[in-house]
Amino acid sequence: MKLKRQKPKEKFSYDPQKVLKKLEDLAWKILEEVKSGKNPYFDVPTRGLNNVYFDEEARLIKLGDKLSRRYFLNVAHARKFTQTLILMAYIKRLVSEGKHASLREAYYANKHTIPGTRENTFEDQSESDPIIEDLERMLGVLREEMHITADRRGYIYGDIVIKDGEDEFNASKLGTGGWAVPGTVEHIQFPEVNVDYVLVVETAAMADRLIEEKYPKKENCLIVATQGQASRGVRRLIHRLHYEEGLPIIVFTDGDPYGWYIYSTIKQGSINLAYLSEKLATPDAKFVGMTMDDIKEYNLEHVTEKLKGIPPDKKGGPTGDYKRLIEELNYPWFQNKEWQRQLKLALKWGVRIEQQALANKSLEFVAKEYLPEKIREGKLLP
């Protein structure tokens, strides 16, 4: 199976003015309610499992339409209402001035004692972070579009030209460490893309192995190392590379419940960030490994690891990996018969298989045989 770029489905569309307009429209609504003597309020999409569902057609985990109304003239709501206005004003200033702030900086920048009272605007970051999430859901924009950033994690390597502000560079010519993915990728542009597909790799050690073996050059692909669970910035970057550049996405993780969950968040989104799935998830992504079938296919039985936790048929079980496996077996997005088979095999055998276990064959095996053969033969899970 030859992987080829497809026709782009989206265009680069970041526009700070759109974010400012949404903020201002919401602020004008509140002002008009105050002027007319009404009790001003915000309608906030409800968080929680009871307002999350799996859209079979879109293949995405989505937020439902339940709302909670937050009034100013309500003792139970007034504090959060005021905090929302404070952060809206702060975000407007950030976007207008073209500056960015971390979640921690946003908390400290807005923490102060209200004049004439002993009341602080925020007592802890655990108060400001949820308000920023509320604004994401209320405005329908990413916090990164509001210039609020998170810690950076992950890197890319391959023949793709990146434009980051005034800087323009090729991600295959920055040394073997590649380009570190920033917390915010909304402003990043791709003037030149010379790869056929994206290979998303869970561990930095495996990504480094593939780079050392010159896999990106030989197979003409872009390596994206997530370094564990993919950050929002990495997931957004993967989404953009697929939808704006038409690049197929192949995911390569450890063969365990954690690795498979990493894949599912890249593909379908996550329950916690269901309201952002349409901007972060990539439903067309495919999974190359590791799988339970790989253990038999490549004679890796002697390098498997035992699942962590207590099995369901033992006292106190299921816990750990076993508990996560059973949860995944019941997720709507893992109901495909191929995935059900893999999950049940893991549960039956009680083992997991790491990416690095392929080194038992040889250091070059993963780059010269395992990945090229599986991708060429189309041995990919949906």
From Swiss-Prot:
GO terms for molecular function: ATP binding; DNA binding; DNA topoisomerase type II (double strand cut, ATP-hydrolyzing) activity; magnesium ion binding. Its cofactor is Mg(2+). GO terms for cellular component: chromosome. The active site is at residue 108. Keywords: ATP-binding, DNA-binding, Isomerase, Magnesium, Metal-binding, Nucleotide-binding, Topoisomerase. Its EC number is 5.6.2.2. It catalyses: ATP-dependent breakage, passage and rejoining of double-stranded DNA. Mg(2+) binds at residues 202, 254. Pfam families: TOP6A-Spo11_Toprim, Topo_VI_alpha, TP6A_N. GO terms for biological process: DNA topological change. Residues 14-155 form the Topo IIA-type catalytic domain. Belongs to the TOP6A family. Homodimer. Heterotetramer of two Top6A and two Top6B chains. PANTHER family: MEIOTIC RECOMBINATION PROTEIN SPO11. Relaxes both positive and negative superturns and exhibits a strong decatenase activity. This is Type 2 DNA topoisomerase 6 subunit A.
